[in-house]
């Protein structure tokens, strides 16, 4: 093992993770924030979420973060964050019986759980009963509503920074910095340093 967590992180179904948050996404976001020095971070999980053991191995890290992505930091506005959050919130829909479910656009023609993003450093209030594109109600950064004219640095993987997955809002954002180390290697280094 390269390190040990306080507790193992069990795999859960994608809808539960999207509703309640993910300890694994929290860990990856913490790694990205430390590696980049950015204000906020986002990450996504693969379509197949696996258990993450308490005794962490390189194999477990690579299984949990299977993408060969590198880390980029970009400068974003509230408008960009709102567009990105709206895209992520479009993951949610309602079944005919009124229960929360995953939108068909993330399930067909291919499964795209990896296009739901988990943010760190923001407190977001959303109303899922509103139409897609009008769900974000509040974006709070450091205890205050984020003003329209304030910019933040956001660390994310190079795939998402390219606008992939329906996140074209990031394509025109200025690049602040880039790390060419794969994110799975950054996670390994982080666990080694903080075990």
Language model: regions and residue ranges:
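Feature captures C-terminal
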Residues: 26-195
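Glycine-rich phosphate/diphosphate-binding loops and the adjacent beta-loop-alpha structural elements
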Residues: 2-23
């Amino acid at each position: 093992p390269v390190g040990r967590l306080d507790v193992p992180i069990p795999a859960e179904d994608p809808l539960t993770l999207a509703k309640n948050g993910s300890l694994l996404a929290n860990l990856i976001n913490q790694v990205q924030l430390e590696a980049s020095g950015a204000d906020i971070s986002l990450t996504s999980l693969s379509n197949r979420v696996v258990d993450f053991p308490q005794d962490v191995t390189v194999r477990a890290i690579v299984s949990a973060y299977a993408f060969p992505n590198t880390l980029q930091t970009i400068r974003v506005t509230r408008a960009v964050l709102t567009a990105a959050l709206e895209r992520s919130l479009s993951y949610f829909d309602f079944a005919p019986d009124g229960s929360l479910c995953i939108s068909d656009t993330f399930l067909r023609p291919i499964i795209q759980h990896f296009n739901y993003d988990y943010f760190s450093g923001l407190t977001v209030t959303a109303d899922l009963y509103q139409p897609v594109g009008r769900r974000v109600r509040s974006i709070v950064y450091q205890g205050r509503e984020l003003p329209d004219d304030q910019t933040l640095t956001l660390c994310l993987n190079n795939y998402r920074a390219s606008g992939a997955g329906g996140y074209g809002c990031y394509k025109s954002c200025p690049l602040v910095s880039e790390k060419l180390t794969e994110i799975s290697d950054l996670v390994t280094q982080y666990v080694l340093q903080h075990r």
